[in-house]
Regions:
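Metal-dependent amide/peptide-bond hydrolase catalytic core
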Residues: 2-170
Length: 170
């Protein structure tokens, strides 16, 4: 889930210590996003992860900003559907928040599903992926498989090694 957040202050001249600094207001909420830990942790996905990824504020060096916009990327687990998580967050922060969408929740396939059990019999180990995929739109049991290391996703030098491809084929 992605949240667009806005902290609103009051513009003023920096030299006269006027106004209410929207950046200072946003910092309190950003600190909450950086430190809060939801109590329910998934065996496969771990805790809910919240990362502030974009911040925009201010227009001039001598003006106290009246608006600070920031974006939060949230990776949920099966204990917190997006709408429930949104309401919990809304009750904790002072900024205005809007979710871009509620439809892409985390997913999990039962470990007792025949496909998962067969994969385990073949020596594969079930795991959780914190990344988002089309799997979130599938309303039937599914698994996410393929070569490579998810930790290299979205990096400047993203790649899959030839040996990883060969191992996946075998």
């Amino acid at each position: 889930m992605v949240l667009d957040c806005v902290s609103t202050g009051k513009a003023g001249h920096a030299a006269r210590n006027e106004g209410i600094n929207a950046i200072t207001l946003a910092m309190k909420d950003i600190e909450w996003f950086n430190t809060y830990q939801f109590p329910e942790k998934s065996d496969f996905l771990g805790p809910v992860k919240m990362s502030v990824t974009i911040i925009h504020a201010g227009t001039q060096h001598n003006v106290v900003p009246d608006r600070c916009e920031f974006t939060v990327d949230i990776r949920t687990n099966e204990f917190y559907p997006n709408e429930k998580l949104f309401e919990l967050i809304k009750s904790q922060v002072g900024c205005e928040i809007k979710a871009r969408s509620f439809r892409l929740n985390s997913t999990r396939t039962d470990l007792q599903h025949p496909f998962v059990r067969r994969a385990v019999m073949m020596g594969k180990e079930p795991f959780g992926s914190p990344t988002l995929s089309d799997q979130a739109l599938m309303h039937f049991p599914s698994v996410k498989i393929g070569p490579g290391n998810s930790a290299r996703s979205h990096a400047a030098d993203e790649y899959i090694g030839l040996m990883e491809i060969r191992a996946a084929i075998d």
